């Protein structure tokens, strides 16, 4: 494994801290601001060096398309459920505080005794849906959407996206540098954001849906809005 320079270690630690505290990596602009680079090109050069040394993986065309590899992620645990019990089941994410990771302790309503491997790929958590914007895809108000945490998705997949301080569930489509978040209901508008901007952060992909009587709906079900 190649040795990292002091500057590369600083960037790696910044990425670790961002993932641990916010649930997603920094943008190039944020790296520049934090470490005093004059140009995003300087940050890009160091990121490419980190990728060559196996410390990170980079996804082209995404401002936050940086992922720590397993060998270097140890010092930056991702936000974890509020229990260490492996038999607790999948966390049910309800009300999400502005600026908090989805799996922050205060966002978890409870745990649902569902085997993650029932879904393909296996789910990491259940997100309580609010609203009818995905009605025609069979995702109703109060349903629990099984979500696989990921920073990449294909066109046509159901995705969980953070828009500023809101979390939404939509179909994904890319077109000419624009991310189109498409509802499955004729009364709701398509949301468009720049693919390389900071307005939208992909939190995961939908891999299944649960509804009553397996998991009763509660009064606080308002995680994913229209």
UniProtKB/Swiss-Prot annotation:
InterPro entries, per database record: LexA, LexA-like, LexA/Signal_pep-like_sf, LexA_DNA-bd_dom, LexA_repressor, Peptidase_S24_LexA, Peptidase_S24_S26A/B/C, WH-like_DNA-bd_sf
EC numbers on record: 3.4.21.88
First-level EC class: hydrolase
DNA-binding region: 28-48
GO molecular function annotations of the record: DNA binding; serine-type endopeptidase activity
Record-annotated active site: 133, 170
Domain of life assignment: Bacteria
Gene Ontology biological-process annotations: DNA repair; DNA replication; negative regulation of DNA-templated transcription; proteolysis; SOS response
Stored CDD domains: S24_LexA-like
Reaction(s) the record says it catalyses: Hydrolysis of Ala-|-Gly bond in repressor LexA
Residue stretches spanning the membrane: none
Site (Cleavage): 98-99
UniProt entry keywords in alphabetical sequence: Autocatalytic cleavage, DNA damage, DNA repair, DNA replication, DNA-binding, Hydrolase, Repressor, SOS response, Transcription, Transcription regulation
Function, in words: Represses a number of genes involved in the response to DNA damage (SOS response), including recA and lexA. In the presence of single-stranded DNA, RecA interacts with LexA causing an autocatalytic cleavage which disrupts the DNA-binding part of LexA, leading to derepression of the SOS regulon and eventually DNA repair.
Assembly notes: Homodimer.
Name of the molecule in the record: LexA repressor
């Amino acid at each position: 494994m190649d040795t990292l320079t002091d500057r590369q270690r600083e960037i790696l630690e910044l990425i670790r801290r961002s993932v641990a505290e916010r649930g997603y990596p920094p943008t190039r602009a944020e790296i520049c601001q934090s470490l005093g680079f004059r140009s995003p090109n300087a940050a890009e050069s160091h990121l490419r060096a980190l990728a060559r040394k196996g410390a990170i993986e980079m996804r082209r065309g995404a401002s936050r398309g940086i992922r720590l590899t397993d060998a270097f992620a140890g010092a930056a645990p991702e936000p974890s459920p509020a229990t260490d019990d492996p038999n607790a089941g999948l966390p049910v994410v309800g009300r999400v505080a502005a600026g908090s990771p989805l799996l922050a302790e205060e966002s978890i309503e409870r745990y649902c005794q569902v085997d993650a491997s029932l879904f393909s790929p296996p789910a990491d958590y259940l997100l309580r849906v609010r609203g009818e914007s995905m009605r025609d895809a069979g995702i109703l108000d109060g349903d629990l959407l099984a979500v696989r945490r990921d920073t990449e998705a294909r066109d046509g997949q159901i995705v969980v996206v953070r828009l500023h301080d809101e979390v939404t569930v939509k179909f994904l489509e890319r077109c000419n540098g624009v991310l189109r978040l498409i509802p499955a209901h004729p009364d709701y508008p398509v949301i468009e954001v720049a693919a390389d901007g900071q307005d939208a952060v992909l939190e995961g992909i939908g891999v299944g849906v649960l509804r009553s009587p397996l998991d009763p709906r509660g009064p606080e079900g308002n995680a994913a809005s229209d």
